[in-house]
Each structure stands twice: as structure tokens, then as C-alpha cells.
Amino acid sequence: RVRKSPYYESTLKYGVTGFTVYNKMYLPTGFSDPSKEYESLINDVTFGDFAAERQIEVSGPDALKFVRYIQPRNLDKCDIGSCKYIILTDMDGGIINDACLLRLEEDKFWLSPGDGDVILWLQGIAINSGMDVAIHEPDVSPLQISGPKSGKLIQKLFKGEHDDLGYYKAMQTSLEDIPMVIARTGWSGEL
């Protein structure tokens, strides 16, 4: 079964030109001419429905121990509010998937993996790990804001409150009483 994001109707309203299926969800693939979208990405600001980048929450007293177990990266400097690019590996070091790891609280992490059933893999490991962790999909739907003017948009939306959010950092906040997590991870090199 393929799910629709909470933004699905809005993408139709604003002229989505196509969808692909990613993580068992519809992911918009474009709204106009691809070269115009590229120009917006490198010169202006873009805003996208990335709800298909489904988050996985790992929480509990052994959350850090569990996250260390599923990937080889040193997390000694993964403080609350840190984001890390990680590679999820099997017991022989083979790559399962990659993900962005966000540490939201002392014992709460979010993983944002690529396409695949990573949550089932993590739940399977947790069952027999002896670690005190809970693994589930939080009810969140990511949006992505990119481009060299994205910082100005965030500044305007949050009235300058998060101007100091560093690269590969995240924080829990709210906008007009809507709780959210904002993360600055970008891949387009605009900021």
C-alpha cells in the first residue's frame, strides 16, 4: 500500500507534475521545468514535501548504546542537537542503508534513512539485543527548504530566533504553536 503525505493535496493544488514511490509514499518529482527548478535551488529558495523521508525514533535508556551498535561511526561527540551522517551496517560491515542521525534528547534519536524497510531491520535487532530501547515511526512529515535564500526564509519564519543553528545541528522548536524539529543538514552547499 502506498501512503499519501499530509501535503499531498497541496502538491496537487500547486501543480505537481509527477510522483514517484519512495518509502511506500508518494514523493513529488517536480512542479515545473527541471532546469527552472535547478536554477531556483542554486539561486533562490525551494520548498519541498519530503514526508517520504520517514523518521525512525530510537528512545530509551540504551538508545545511545543501540545507535552505536548499528553503525560504525564514533558518536563520542554526538551531543544533544547534533546531526551525523551515518552508514547502517550488517554484522560483516556490509551497507544496509545510510541515514542522517539526529540526537534530540539524551535518550532519544531520530534516524532519517533512505528508501527501505530500515525500521523493520532495527526492530529485529532490538528484539534480541537485550537493550532497553523502543523503536517506532514518529508522526512527523518532513519538509525541506533549500537554496541560498533558505536561511533568510527561516530567519523570517522564526523572527531570527534560530539564526545560530549550525551546520549539521538540530533543535526542537515550534512555529505558531506547531511543535517541530528543524535540522540544518543540506546537501546543496548553499549556506
Question: Where are the language model's segments positioned?
Answer:
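Acidic, low-complexity central loop/insert segments
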Residues: 97-191
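Acidic, proline/glycine-enriched N-terminal capping motif
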Residues: 1-89, 94
